[in-house]
């Protein structure tokens, strides 16, 4: 469902989900019974029910609260690092950019809100992989491998390094692995409110700063930012 197609029939849902129509019919019947879908008799189609709408509304409010609280310290860190600080949310095998702040000293860095970036090669994604439960991470790595068998050896090596880095220094790194001219580090957190796992990264142009500056100077501030945000979202945080 989206703004253009507010009503869908079983056949349309089956085509979009690549499921047998009989399976979809059983699912839509059940979802209608529990309030997640509403059946429109005139068109014999379905639209989102009250339970779904309220659930999505609550998720949106939670997401807006994360963005509102994260924005000021993210901008401060972007100015300090002379780079870009991004807030990303995991969605399947990708990360979605939710918010980003850029220093005026880093005009070449750009990441649009809503853009998808890969899990395996970005600091944002590697940080999320590092904090996932082992069984969930194993399943996700299998899906990532199936998406890119040819490039998997290199991707896997980068992921394993990111996991090791997270254990040793509290963040995952991507030094030119996703974008050759950008070095980045990231820390993950669980925002609560029904939202999926998130992470915050700080990226700087390779030509501006060495990885050592990111690890020695930026990393402690990034970790403090994320820990404050996590505690602030449950009401116990003190501004970093």
Walk through the language-model features, giving the residues of each:
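N-terminal helix-turn-helix
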Residues: 1-64, 227-235
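An N-terminal domain-start capping segment
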Residues: 1-8, 74-97, 224-240
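Juxtadomain coupling helices with adjacent low-complexity linkers
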Residues: 156-159, 180-181, 196-240
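Sensor-regulatory modules in signal-transduction proteins
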Residues: 189-192
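Short, basic/aromatic recognition patches
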Residues: 69-77, 141-187, 232
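Amphipathic alpha-helical effector-binding/dimerization core
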Residues: 42, 47-143
């Amino acid at each position: 469902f989206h703004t253009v197609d507010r009503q869908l029939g079983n056949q349309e849902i089956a085509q979009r989900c690549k499921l047998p129509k009989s399976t979809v019919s059983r699912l839509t019947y059940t979802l209608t019974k529990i309030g997640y879908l509403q059946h429109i008799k005139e068109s014999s189609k379905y639209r989102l029910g009250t339970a779904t709408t309220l659930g999505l509304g609550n998720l949106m409010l939670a997401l807006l609260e994360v963005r509102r609280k994260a924005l000021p310290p993210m901008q401060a860190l972007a100015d300090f690092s002379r780079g870009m600080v991004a807030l990303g949310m995991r969605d399947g095998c990708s990360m979605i950019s939710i918010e980003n702040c850029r220093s005026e000293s880093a005009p070449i860095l750009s990441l649009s809100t809503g853009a998808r970036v890969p899990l395996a090669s970005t600091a944002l994604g590697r940080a999320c992989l590092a904090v996932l439960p082992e069984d969930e991470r194993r399943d996700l790595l299998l899906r990532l491998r199936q998406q890119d068998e040819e490039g998997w050896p290199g991707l896997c090596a980068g992921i394993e390094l990111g996991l090791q880095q997270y254990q040793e220094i509290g963040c995952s790194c991507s030094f030119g692995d996703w974008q050759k001219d950008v070095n980045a580090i990231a820390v993950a957190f669980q925002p609560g409110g029904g939202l999926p796992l998130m992470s915050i990264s700080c990226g700087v142009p390779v030509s501006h700063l060495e990885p050592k500056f990111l690890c020695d100077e930026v990393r402690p501030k990034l970790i403090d930012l994320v820990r404050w945000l996590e505690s602030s979202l449950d009401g116990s945080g003190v501004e970093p």
